[in-house]
Regions:
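Intrinsically disordered, low-complexity non-transmembrane regions of multi-pass membrane transporters
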Residues: 1-24, 208-232, 266-273, 281, ...
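N-terminal signal-anchor module of multipass membrane proteins
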Residues: 1-74, 78-94
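Juxtamembrane interface elements at the cytosolic ends of transmembrane helices
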Residues: 6, 34-35, 169-179, 187, ...
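Membrane-embedded helical hairpins/re-entrant loop segments and their flanking transmembrane helices
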Residues: 9-19, 45-63, 245-318
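Hydrophobic, membrane-embedded alpha-helices of multi-pass small-molecule transporters
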Residues: 20-36, 161-169, 187-188, 219-260, ...
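Re-entrant/interfacial helical elements at transmembrane boundaries that shape
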Residues: 38-43, 73-86, 259-268, 299-312, ...
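Interfacial segments of multi-pass membrane proteins
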Residues: 85-91, 177, 306-321, 327-332
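Membrane-embedded alpha-helical modules
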Residues: 94-207, 323-427
C-alpha cells in the first residue's frame, strides 16, 4: 500500500544494494544508533554488550513480525531510564523489578497489538490524547535531573575536572545538534561521547584497567531469570509495586512508535501502519522489548536516528537495516571493544544526561504545542498540573498491595481526570 513519498528513493524497501556498498550503508546505520544505544546501559549500569546484542536481535525479531517490509532499527529506549533507575534504587540495586517491568511492558505492547488488530485505533486516541502524552514525557525527562547533575559534578562537593568534562561534552552535543550538517547531525550522541571521552582522557580521568583485563572475544554478560550455574548473573522475576510502576511508560512509547512509523511512511511513500499494519509493528516491538529485558538489557524502541539516515541517503532497503543488526550482534562479542566503552567516565555521561533529559522534557512541551492543546480550557490546566506535581513531587499512593508513584501515578491521574472532567462550554 503506497502513498506519495517525500523523498526520491534510490533503493526502495524491497531492493538490495551491491554487497560492498551494502556493508558500508549498514555500518552507517550502526554509527547512527550506536551513541544512543550504548548511552542507556551506561547510565543504568547495565552491560553494554547485552544492549548491543539485544538491539540487533530485537531488530531481527521486529523484521520477522513485519514480514521484512519495514526498514526500522530498534535500539535502547530512553523513556524507561527514569522508571528503571527508580526501581533499582527502591530494590537496593537489584535489577529484578526493572527487568520484570520491562518484560511485562513488552506484553502490554502485544495486548495493544491484539486490540488494534480487532478493534482499530480510535480507542488509543480517546484514552491517550496529547494532554496526557505531553506531561508524561515531561515527567519522564525531569525525573532523573538530579542524578544527571550529580554525575556531571555540578554539586557543592563536586570535582572541578568532572564538571569541566561534563560541560565540554554538553557543548559538543549542543553545537553538533545546532550547527552540524548531514550525517554529523544524525549522530550527535556518538561524537559528543567521543569528544568528552578524549577530553577526560587528557585530564587523567580514564582508567584502562578493564580493557587490559578483557579478552578479545567474550560472550555478552547476560542477566537471566534462572540459575546458569554461575555462567551468567541471575535476577528473579518480581511482580511487586516497583515492577508495576514501569508499565505506564508504554503509554508514551506506543505513541512514539506510531509517530516514528508515520514519519517513515512519508519518507518511503508507504503506509506502514496499514501494511503490514500497526498491530504487526507493535507486536514486533513488544516481543523485542521483552526478549531484551529477559536477557538483562534495556527496553527497545524504534530509532528516529536511523529513519533520519534513510531520509538522508534515500536508501530504504530492509536488507541494509537487517545487516546492521547482524553487525551490532557481532560487536557485542568483542570483549575489549565493550570494555573500552565501559571506561567512559560518569562526567561524560552526566554532560550527556543533562542534555538528554532536558530534550526529552522539552519534547513533552513540543507535543502540547504541536497538537495545539488549549490551555484556555481549565480542564487541561488541571490535568497537566496534577500530572506534573504528582509525577515530580515524590507523591506515593498505596492501594492495597499496589503502590503508585512517579510516572505511574502521573499517568493514572491524567487518564482518570481526562475521562471524568467535562469540557467547558465557552458559549
Amino acid at each position: 500500500m503506497k502513498q506519495e513519498s517525500t523523498v526520491d528513493l534510490l533503493l526502495d524497501v524491497d531492493q538490495r544494494p551491491s554487497a560492498g556498498k551494502g556493508i558500508l550503508l549498514s555500518f552507517q546505520h550502526v554509527f547512527a544508533m550506536f551513541g544512543a544505544t550504548i548511552l542507556v546501559p551506561l547510565i543504568l549500569g547495565m552491560p553494554v554488550s547485552v544492549a548491543l546484542f539485544a538491539s540487533g536481535v530485537g531488530t531481527l525479531i521486529y523484521m520477522i513480525a513485519t514480514g521484512f517490509r519495514v526498514p526500522v532499527y530498534l535500539g535502547s529506549s530512553f523513556a524507561f531510564i527514569t522508571a528503571m533507575s527508580l526501581a533499582m534504587k527502591e530494590m537496593g540495586g537489584d535489577v529484578s523489578a526493572a527487568q520484570t517491568g520491562v518484560i511485562l511492558t513488552g506484553f502490554v505492547y502485544v495486548l495493544v497489538a491484539a486490540s488494534v488488530r480487532f478493534a482499530g485505533t480510535k480507542w488509543i486516541d480517546k484514552l491517550l490524547p496529547p494532554i496526557i502524552i505531553g506531561p508524561m514525557i515531561i515527567v519522564i525527562g525531569l525525573g532523573l535531573a538530579g542524578s544527571a547533575v550529580t554525575n556531571a559534578g555540578l554539586v557543592a562537593d563536586g570535582n572541578w575536572k568532572n564538571a569541566l568534562v561534563a560541560v565540554v561534552t554538553f557543548l559538543i552535543a549542543a553545537f553538533i545538534n545546532t550547527k552540524g550538517k548531514g550525517f554529523l547531525r544524525i549522530i550527535p550522541f556518538l561524537f559528543a561521547i567521543i569528544g568528552g571521552y578524549l577530553f577526560a582522557l587528557a585530564l587523567g580521568l580514564v582508567d584502562f584497567t578493564p580493557v587490559l583485563q578483557a579478552n578479545w572475544f567474550e560472550i555478552p554478560g547476560f542477566y537471566l531469570p534462572f540459575s546458569t550455574g554461575g555462567a551468567f548473573k541471575q535476577y528473579d522475576l518480581y511482580f511487586g509495586p516497583e515492577t508495576i510502576a514501569i508499565l505506564p511508560i508504554a503509554i508514551v512509547t506506543i505513541s512514539e512508535h506510531i509517530g516514528d512509523h508515520t514519519v517513515l511512511s512519508q519518507i518511503c511513500g508507504r503506509q506502514f501502519l496499514k501494511d503490514p499494519g500497526l498491530h504487526r509493528t507493535l507486536l514486533g516491538d513488544g516481543i523485542a522489548t521483552s526478549v531484551s529485558a529477559f536477557l538483562g538489557g534495556p527496553a527497545n524502541t524504534t530509532y528516529g536516528e536511523n529513519t533520519g539516515v534513510i531520509g538522508m541517503t534515500r536508501i530504504a532497503s530492509v536488507s541494509v537495516i537487517r545487516n546492521a543488526a547482524f553487525i551490532a550482534i557481532a560487536l557485542s562479542f568483542l570483549g575489549k571493544f565493550t570494555a573500552l566503552i565501559s571506561t567512559i567516565p560518569n562526567a561524560v555521561l552526566g554532560g550527556m544526561s543533562i542534555l538528554l533529559y532536558g530534550v526529552i522534557a522539552s519534547n513533552g512541551l513540543k507535543v502540547l504545542i504541536k497538537e495545539r492543546v488549549d490551555f484556555g480550557q481549565m480542564r487541561n490546566l488541571i490535568i497537566a498540573s496534577a500530572m506534573l506535581v504528582l509525577g515530580l513531587g515524590g507523591a506515593i499512593l498505596k492501594l492495597g498491595p499496589v503502590t503508585l508513584s512517579g510516572t505511574a501515578l502521573s499517568a493514572m491521574t491524567g487518564i482518570i481526570l481526562n475521562l471524568i472532567l467535562p469540557y467547558e462550554n465557552k458559549n
